[in-house]
């Protein structure tokens, strides 16, 4: 078996080119009538906006003609000048008709009335110019002429217009091509239960808004722009200020109850009575059984977060105790799932009782717990909602996990939630967390379990990430609670088994959270992407940790970490072994990163995009990537919808691979025999484009001749400046053990 290789080296950087003048697509046209329609829709917004609104500015939504890239969003419309550009006024984004024939963006902006009136005036002037100077219609050729015609340039001001610049006119034409109309969006419907309501971000403090609306909201029920409201309070808000409401979800979460069928049996284990220096995994779940402590209780540091007036019953303890039992000692009760990861300590936080509970309350607990326990790098959450997640916004619970993961450099392993009636259902929160490692369940036949729910989330983000064994009817997982071993079924019990592997990689193999996630996904996917990615994610994780950290002798697997700081981040020095004039190999690569996220942006939730290109370097100097991808190139013709669906644009996991089949053939070697990697970085916001973004990449190369070329690869990497390290399991374990020794100074 070949060990995993860690490469350490520098990526070169280059800034992207500045955008050129505003243009139209080759066959695109904009008529004076279209401009007039857009202007009138904006005038309607002004007339319909409540005169007694309790916020200073106006929330106006722009409907685009399609799913638009950042470069095709409005730039002249709703432009309030420096530091008031349209991208800074966005307060929400969602899709219209995403699964229909005409998917498109709807974005909500928060702008002063003066900015809207200014846009109306500019559109009126733009319409006049199109009629007077361009025969009532603009097309791509006229837009080019507008830039290159020196005579037109010289006479523009004041002959053509003294209020609208030539570049401003051109940008208005481009904006008009992509915009359908403006409007005031409708708020979400009322609910019959308590709801977590998110307000649009304005200059007003949410607490002050509720006081002015005479709605009594406790500060304890506020979390940033989200608030927990009763059914009556929410209806009052919709009656008095519906324009404030960005999104809402029911405040009820649960977990699929464990079956009462079967009975507990004595637990059998050789677990040492007390732990020593084993890694700690955090568990946030129902209470841990202390009245009848299970055999592994010395390995669990339990801390109750429940109010003192709540007295849990025996059923309240079962779920959380069973989850922790699998983390501590899963192999004892499930020999066929022995992952060779050893034992783990658990710091267990009881935040909910059996059945339904307030997800808002749990959110408040999670935020505090993670902040106060920063020594824990891996957290398991097997609680979730029975309600399906929204297609247009991330859940509040998932948004919190994404924020905490990015802020504290931790990894959440989250259960994919269960269907309780056998009917297909989308995932429940917080399994829509983008940064978390979301785990669904399979049976022993490697098929989705009968209760498995499905992704994607936000209409196109791949979730779940992975699948693992969670038991099913007649073939359960064995967990332990206070009364002994117990038959368990659900994603709740698949997740902790994956959390063990993640913790092993992060604590004992010294991998970053990004690399641990990438390595698990790469190993699960292998050379075959599942047909049912909506339920299986990228595949089923191998049982034994060696299958993740080692490869067969005809494969080379290496990993590297970096920080993307500029538009282009590249290294063209990967010496993939050559045989004669060919590369007798196929390859795959997996990129993971944890971007900052903004729930207020709706479907445009992630702030940063990293686009992965890896492959041979052609004679033109470009990377011939494993997945054909010309995003970022001058000849790019990929539209935003295809980029999101096919190339995973804005998804924080990128997996690209060549197929490995009996028909796979060696590839040509070009003038430069090296392979290259390019990571193109872009931001939702122009001002955020230089913020650094950490990433991890795992690459696997399979030799079609069955040859072991790892020594050649290591030797060549060292010769060209890479720092090369074999990740030997035994060596890494010794390093971990030595790091846990306490040194006493006299």
Question: Which stretches of residues belong to each language-model region?
Answer:
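Subtilisin-like serine protease catalytic core
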Residues: 270-303, 309-359, 409, 433-435, ...
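Extracellular S/T/G-rich loop segment that most often corresponds to the catalytic His/Ser-adjacent loop
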Residues: 285-287, 426-503
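Exposed low-complexity, polar/acidic, P/S/T/G-rich flexible segments that act as propeptides
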Residues: 584-624, 682-746
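Long, charged/polar, low-complexity intrinsically disordered N-terminal extensions
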Residues: 1-186, 724-746
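C-terminal subdomain of the subtilisin-like protease fold in secreted/lumenal serine endopeptidases
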Residues: 507-586
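Mature extracellular/periplasmic domains of secretome proteins
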Residues: 8-12, 270-277, 340, 357-380, ...
């Amino acid at each position: 078996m070949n060990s995993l290789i860690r490469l350490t080296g520098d990526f070169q950087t280059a800034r992207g080119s500045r955008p050129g003048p505003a243009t139209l697509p080759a066959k695109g046209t904009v008529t004076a009538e279209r401009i007039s329609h857009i202007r009138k829709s904006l005038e309607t917004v002004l007339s319909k906006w409540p005169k007694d609104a309790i916020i200073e500015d106006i929330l106006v939504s722009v409907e685009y003609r399609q799913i638009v890239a950042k470069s095709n969003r409005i730039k002249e419309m709703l432009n309030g000048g420096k530091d008031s550009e349209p991208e800074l006024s966005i307060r929400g984004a969602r899709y219209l008709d995403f699964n229909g024939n005409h998917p498109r963006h709807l974005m909500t902006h928060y702008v002063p009335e003066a900015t809207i009136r200014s846009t109306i005036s500019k559109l009126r002037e733009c319409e006049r110019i199109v009629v007077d100077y361009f025969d009532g219609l603009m097309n791509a050729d006229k837009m080019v002429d507008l830039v290159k015609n020196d005579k037109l340039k010289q006479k523009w001001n004041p002959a053509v217009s003294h209020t609208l610049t030539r570049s401003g006119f051109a940008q208005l034409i481009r904006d008009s091509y992509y915009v359908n109309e403006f409007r005031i969006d409708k708020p979400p419907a009322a609910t019959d239960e308590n709801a977590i309501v998110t307000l649009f971000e304005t200059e007003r403090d949410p607490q002050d808004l509720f006081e002015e609306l005479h709605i009594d909201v406790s500060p304890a029920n506020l979390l940033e722009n989200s608030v927990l409201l009763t059914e009556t309070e929410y209806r009052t808000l919709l009656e008095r200020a519906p324009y404030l409401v960005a999104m809402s979800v029911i405040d009820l979460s649960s977990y699929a109850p464990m079956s009462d069928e079967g009975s507990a049996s004595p637990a059998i284990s050789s677990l040492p009575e007390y732990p020593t220096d084993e890694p700690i995994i955090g568990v946030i779940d129902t209470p841990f059984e202390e009245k009848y402590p299970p055999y592994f209780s010395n390995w669990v540091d339990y801390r109750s977060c429940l109010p003192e007036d709540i007295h849990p019953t025996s059923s309240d303890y079962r779920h959380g105790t069973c989850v922790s039992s699998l983390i501590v000692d899963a192999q004892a009760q499930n020999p066929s799932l022995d992952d060779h990861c050893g034992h783990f300590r658990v710091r267990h936080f009881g935040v909910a009782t059996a059945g339904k509970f307030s997800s808002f309350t749990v959110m408040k607990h999670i935020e505090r717990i993670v902040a106060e326990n920063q020594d824990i790098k891996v957290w398991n959450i097997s609680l979730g909602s029975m309600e399906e997640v929204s297609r247009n916004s991330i859940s509040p619970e998932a948004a919190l996990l994404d924020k905490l993961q990015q802020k504290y450099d931790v990894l959440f392993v989250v259960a994919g939630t269960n269907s309780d009636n056998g009917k297909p259902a989308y995932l429940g929160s917080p399994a829509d967390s983008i940064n978390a490692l979301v785990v669904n369940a399979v049976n022993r036949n490697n098929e989705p379990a009968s209760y498995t729910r499905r992704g994607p989330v936000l209409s196109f983000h791949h979730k779940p990430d992975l699948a693992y064994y969670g038991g099913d009817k007649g073939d359960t997982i064995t967990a332990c609670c206070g009364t002994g071993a117990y038959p368990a079924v659900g994603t709740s019990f698949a997740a902790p088994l994956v959390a063990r592997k993640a913790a092993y990689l992060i604590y004992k193999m010294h991998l970053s959270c990004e690399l641990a996630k990438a390595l698990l996904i790469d190993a699960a996917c292998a050379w075959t992407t599942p047909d049912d990615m909506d339920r299986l994610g990228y595949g089923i994780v191998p049982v034994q940790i060696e299958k993740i950290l080692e490869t067969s002798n005809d494969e080379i697997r290496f990993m590297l970490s970096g920080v993307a700081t500029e538009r282009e981040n590249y290294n063209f020095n990967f010496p993939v072994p050559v045989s004669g004039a060919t590369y007798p190999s196929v390859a795959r690569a997996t990129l993971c990163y944890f971007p900052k996220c903004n729930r207020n942006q709706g479907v445009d939730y992630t702030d940063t995009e990293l686009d992965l290109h890896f492959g041979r370097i052609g004679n033109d100097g470009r990377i011939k990537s494993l997945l054909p991808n010309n995003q970022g190139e001058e000849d790019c013709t990929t539209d935003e919808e295809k980029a999101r669906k096919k190339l995973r644009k804005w998804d924080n996991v990128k997996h690209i691979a060549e197929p490995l089949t009996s028909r796979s053939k060696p590839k040509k070697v070009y003038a430069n025999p090296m392979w290259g990697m390019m990571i193109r970085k872009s931001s939702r916001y122009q001002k955020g484009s230089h913020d650094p973004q950490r990433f991890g990449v795992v690459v696997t190369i399979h030799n079609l001749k069955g040859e072991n070329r790892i020594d050649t690869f290591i030797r060549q990497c060292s010769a060209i400046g890479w720092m090369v390290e074999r990740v030997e399991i035994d060596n890494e374990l010794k390093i971990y053990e030595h790091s846990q020794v306490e040194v006493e100074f006299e």
